[in-house]
Structure formats: structure tokens, C-alpha cells
């Protein structure tokens, strides 16, 4: 890999991470968009793992990516299931009303 390719890939990863942060701060009311923004940030971090794994010729980063993507998929499925149940009970999905959960 040339230094230009590494710089471009790291810049692309930074842009993805920044879009995730921006999505969280712009839409503070919608829980689903916040969840997608967090997943986008996790994707950017995994992309960094892939870049440095290829750069250092080490397979640990790629194995770690598979592990984290598996856990992220399970986490997203559980989060969406909780949101669907919350929507059926309350009729609205908003950050303001999530504090009314009892547990």
C-alpha cells in the first residue's frame, strides 16, 4: 500500500465516523437514527482495524472485525426488538419517552 492509499482510507474512515457523530447530535429525538449512527461509528472503527491489519500483515484485526460485526448485529437486533415492543405499548419512539421505562 502506498501512503496515499492509506491516507485516503483513513480519511474515509474518519468521514464515516464523523457522520455517525453528526447523526447522533442532529437527531436527538429519534432512537432508531441514533442506533444507526452508533452502528455507523462502529463500522468506521472496524474499517480502521481492517486498514491496519492489512498494513501490518496481521490477521488479528480481521478476526476481531468478524467478532465485533457479529456482536453488533446481535445488539442491533435486540435493540430494534425492544424499540418495536416499546412502540406497540406507547405508540411513539422518542428519546423523551424512553425514560418512562420501568425495570
From Swiss-Prot:
The gene is ND4L. The lineage of its organism: Eukaryota, Amoebozoa, Discosea, Longamoebia, Centramoebida. GO terms for molecular function: NADH dehydrogenase (ubiquinone) activity. It comes from the Eukaryota. This is NADH-ubiquinone oxidoreductase chain 4L. It is found in: Mitochondrion membrane. Gene3D superfamilies: 1.10.287.3510. It catalyses: a ubiquinone + NADH + 5 H(+)(in) = a ubiquinol + NAD(+) + 4 H(+)(out). Pfam families: Oxidored_q2. InterPro entries: NADH_UbQ_OxRdtase_chain4L/K, NUOK/Mnh_C1-like. The keyword Transcription does not apply. GO terms for cellular component: mitochondrial membrane; NADH dehydrogenase complex. Disulfide bonds: none annotated. HAMAP family: NDH1_NuoK. It is an enzyme of class 7 (translocase). Keywords: Electron transport, Membrane, Mitochondrion, NAD, Respiratory chain, Translocase, Transmembrane, Transmembrane helix, Transport, Ubiquinone. The chain crosses the membrane at residues 6-26, 31-51, 65-85. Core subunit of the mitochondrial membrane respiratory chain NADH dehydrogenase (Complex I) that is believed to belong to the minimal assembly required for catalysis. Complex I functions in the transfer of electrons from NADH to the respiratory chain. The immediate electron acceptor for the enzyme is believed to be ubiquinone. It comes from Acanthamoeba castellanii (Amoeba). One of its GO terms (biological process) is ATP synthesis coupled electron transport. NCBIfam families: PRK05715.1-2, PRK05715.1-3, PRK05715.1-5. Its EC number is 7.1.1.2. Belongs to the complex I subunit 4L family. It is a multi-pass membrane protein.
Amino acid at each position: 500500500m502506498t501512503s496515499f492509499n492509506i491516507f485516503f482510507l483513513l480519511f474515509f474512515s474518519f468521514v464515516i465516523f464523523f457522520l455517525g457523530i453528526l447523526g447522533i447530535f442532529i437527531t436527538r429525538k429519534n432512537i432508531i437514527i441514533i442506533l444507526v449512527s452508533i452502528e455507523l461509528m462502529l463500522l468506521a472503527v472496524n474499517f480502521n482495524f481492517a486498514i491496519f491489519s492489512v498494513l501490518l500483515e496481521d490477521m488479528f484485526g480481521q478476526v476481531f472485525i468478524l467478532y465485533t460485526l457479529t456482536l453488533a448485529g446481535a445488539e442491533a437486533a435486540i435493540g430494534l426488538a425492544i424499540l418495536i415492543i416499546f412502540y406497540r405499548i406507547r405508540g411513539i419512539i422518542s428519546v423523551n419517552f424512553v425514560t418512562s421505562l420501568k425495570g
